[in-house]
Amino acid sequence: MTTPPANHAALLARRARVLAPTYQLFYEQPLQIVRAEDVWMYDESGRRYLDAYNNVPVVGHCHPQVVEALARQARTVNTHTRYLAEQPLQLAEELLATLPPELGSAIFTCTGSEANDLAVRISKAVTGGSGFIVTEFAYHGATDVIAGMSPEDGNPLGPGVYTVPPPLGAAGDGDFGAQVGACLERMRADGVRLAAMLVDTIFASDGVVPEPRGFLADAVRRVHEAGGLFIADEVQPGFGRLGEAMWGFQRHGVVPDLVTTGKPMGNGHPIAAVAGRAGVFAEFARGRRYFNTYGGNSVSCAAALAVLQVIRAENLLANAQRSGEYLRRGLRELALRHTAIREVRGAGLFIGVELGANSASGLGGAAETRRIVNAMCRRGVLVGSTGRNANVLKIRPPLTLEPQHADLLLDALDQSLQSRV
């Protein structure tokens, strides 16, 4: 293991002194990142790292068009939605143009957590229900209400929150619709009225489950028949990450009642949204209002608008599809040589690599995955981990990733699997 830079001890001491212990750092040897560009992040020594993990900079770190849009608007005016302004209207129009026509309105927030919190509030008001269905290892955000719907973090479930097992994928024998149906029966037996089913459409925290395509449809049908709404959490899979479509729910042939977005929407600038059916919003607005001081502010909207424009202009959905297929093919070739790789799953540039026991390291499951994440970091490639058993490598690079970058990732993973450290 390399020796950490001398200044890290001082930074860690300052951090421990002034930041609450709820904060966590990535990697056994934390990185000090001082600048970034496209798919690269640079530490204080100038060493570069391939960022294959942070799905926030969806069009690449510090994209010049996004930076210029931010700066130009910040030099002009930054205000909120209680004044007439062009920026939130243009952003809403362009965002809604990427969604099914049934989803005709949007509300802006600052984070995906806020967006999910608002979607939950809307669903309660519209349905009169208080029950929610999420998957067993879901993560949907950090507000008090949404933390109670995010069992990944070990949070206790909130009142009226029920869980279902995640879909098992093409290789499994699970029927997600049947699981949701059984959950609805439990809720009825408990006298709980359904408000909504909230799912991340790539099931990222459950281990990345994109297949079989269409498995959500039966579950959504059952939810609607029970009088509930379907909330598609697109904070992680949205904005073209899955390649073939802008949004994860589109791969399943369903139209949500509410769609939430977040992380990549501003390419690092805090902006998020809830899009929904006109009737749902109209019912919510009856006797209620929602205002968020920074949700829909001029500068954030300028950044998000630039992100949408870059995705179109640079044809990033097609690149995510092409580079994602290249990377998954390379990962499956590695699996033929490394028995530690159990399965490669994914769509576009959202990929999960499930790991098991590795004879080279003598480790298995979560311990091996943790070792691989840190070994790849030492080799200049950043990935993360996810899943109920913490044994799935999570790969989410900017949509600008090219095959030559994928080759660097594949080489780092190959070397890490062969090593003992």
Model features per residue range: what roles?
Residues 1-421:
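Conserved N-terminal phosphate-binding loop of PLP-dependent enzymes in the Aspartate aminotransferase
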